[in-house]
């Protein structure tokens, strides 16, 4: 699973996801992509599950690019622990996804396979998505 090699601080504020994505809204690598339509925090496990679903449907042909990276540590307190006494320990990593952000790109497969692969990948994610493709003039 994806996670940063090293961070300056162990814990981070929760934060909010306001507004549309500033960058990463266009296809840069592949011919087809999966674009987020709403703000959400996507965990490293969800990204990996989507990647596996996409790769399996493509039968390991073509190429997959993951355009988001989980760089936010999410903390949790153990179960049945009273409130107070500090913040919990970092449990997993998540990526903040803004609306309009391209999350996955694929290339080297036919459009129908790409559509189905990204549909299966989108089912693993907690965010509404849209299939996009490069416009060739």
UniProtKB/Swiss-Prot annotation:
Its keywords, alphabetically, are: Ribonucleoprotein, Ribosomal protein, RNA-binding, rRNA-binding, tRNA-binding
Q: Name one GO cellular component term.
A: cytosolic large ribosomal subunit
Cross-referenced SUPFAM superfamilies, in alphabetical order?
Ribosomal protein L16p/L10e
Q: Which InterPro entries match?
A: Ribosomal_uL16 (IPR047873), Ribosomal_uL16_bact-type (IPR000114), Ribosomal_uL16_CS (IPR020798), Ribosomal_uL16_dom (IPR016180), Ribosomal_uL16_sf (IPR036920)
The Swiss-Prot or TrEMBL record annotates one GO molecular function as: rRNA binding
Kindly give the Gene3D superfamilies that the UniProt entry links to this protein.
Answer: Ribosomal protein L10e/L16 (3.90.1170.10)
A Pfam family matched in the record: Ribosomal_L16
* GO biological processes: translation
Taking the record's annotation, the residue ranges forming a coiled coil are: none
Q: Which CDD domains match?
A: Ribosomal_L16_L10e
Q: What role does this protein play?
A: Binds 23S rRNA and is also seen to make contacts with the A and possibly P site tRNAs.
Q: How does it assemble?
A: Part of the 50S ribosomal subunit.
The family this protein is said to belong to: Belongs to the universal ribosomal protein uL16 family.
What is the protein name stated in its UniProt record?
Answer: Large ribosomal subunit protein uL16
Query: From what organism does this protein derive?
Result: Methylobacterium nodulans (strain LMG 21967 / CNCM I-2342 / ORS 2060)
């Amino acid at each position: 699973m994806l996670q940063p090699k090293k961070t300056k601080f162990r814990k981070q504020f929760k934060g909010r996801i306001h507004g549309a994505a500033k960058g990463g809204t266009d296809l840069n690598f592949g011919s087809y992509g999966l674009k987020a339509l709403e703000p959400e925090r996507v965990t490293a496990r969800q990204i990996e599950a989507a990647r596996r679903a996409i790769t399996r449907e493509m039968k390991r042909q073509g190429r997959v690019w993951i355009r988001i990276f989980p760089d936010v540590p999410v903390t949790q307190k153990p179960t049945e622990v009273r409130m107070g006494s500090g913040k919990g320990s970092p449990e997993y990593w998540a990526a903040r996804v803004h609306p309009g952000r391209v999350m996955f790109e694929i290339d080297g497969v036919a459009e129908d396979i790409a559509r189905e692969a990204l549909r299966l990948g989108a089912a693993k994610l907690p965010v509404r998505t849209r299939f996009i493709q490069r416009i060739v003039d």
